[in-house]
Amino acid sequence: MDKFTTLEGVAAPLKIINVDTDMIIPKQYLKTIKRTGLGKGLFSEQRYKDDGSENPDFVLNQPAYRNTKVLVAGDNFGCGSSREHAPWALLDFGIRCVISTSFGDIFYNNCFKNGILPIRVSQEDLDKLFDDAERGANATLTIDLPNQEIRGPDGGKVKFEIDPFRKHCLINGLDDIGLTMEKKASIDTYEDKLKRERAWA
């Protein structure tokens, strides 16, 4: 998992509340267990028309937001059914941070496991970030995880809270396997001790 310290990039405004995981990645893309290639399915029912052509009105199809790294979204983002493909699709598209007032619990947890930073902010702060994100090509936000703050294009700052353990994992790029390997020396020491004490086993 890639480390997450400071992220600077274009932020796209998605002013829709209750975006569920089926909207993020529709069910027809769930057949694969690969984490790559799912970016094409991200918001596919909003990004594409019935004939397969792009919907120019959807924010991620607009030139200023095609390479967005940050998504500023409406309340209760990622609600609905459990599907880890949702953060996979966001990550494959290039999005590493989602900012909202609240998230679906399972989606929120899955984001951390896949190297995406979900940030909860107040409605007042979200409205300010929407204003920043609506600047198009100038909608650059800086996400400073070590200092737990979001910096806008005009230098304005929004502070955010994060669980210290999850912060540690993101900064060091630790997924479940990485966490285990971080404790490898302790595990090896314990196993050696066990072998000595239970040589008969």
Curated annotation (Swiss-Prot):
Keyword tags: Amino-acid biosynthesis, Branched-chain amino acid biosynthesis, Leucine biosynthesis, Lyase
Class in the EC hierarchy, top level: lyase
GO molecular function: 3-isopropylmalate dehydratase activity
SUPFAM superfamilies listed in its UniProt record: LeuD/IlvD-like (SSF52016)
A family per Pfam: Aconitase_C
Pathway: Amino-acid biosynthesis; L-leucine biosynthesis; L-leucine from 3-methyl-2-oxobutanoate: step 2/4
Highest taxon of source: Bacteria
Enzymatic reactions: (2R,3S)-3-isopropylmalate = (2S)-2-isopropylmalate
Any one of the GO CC terms: 3-isopropylmalate dehydratase complex
Database matches in CDD domains: IPMI_Swivel
Listed InterPro entries: 3-IsopropMal_deHydase_ssu, Aconitase/3IPM_dehydase_swvl, AconitaseA/IPMdHydase_ssu_swvl, IPMI_Swivel, LeuD
Family membership: Belongs to the LeuD family. LeuD type 1 subfamily.
Complex formation: Heterodimer of LeuC and LeuD.
This protein's name: 3-isopropylmalate dehydratase small subunit
Organism: Bradyrhizobium diazoefficiens (strain JCM 10833 / BCRC 13528 / IAM 13628 / NBRC 14792 / USDA 110)
Protein's gene: leuD
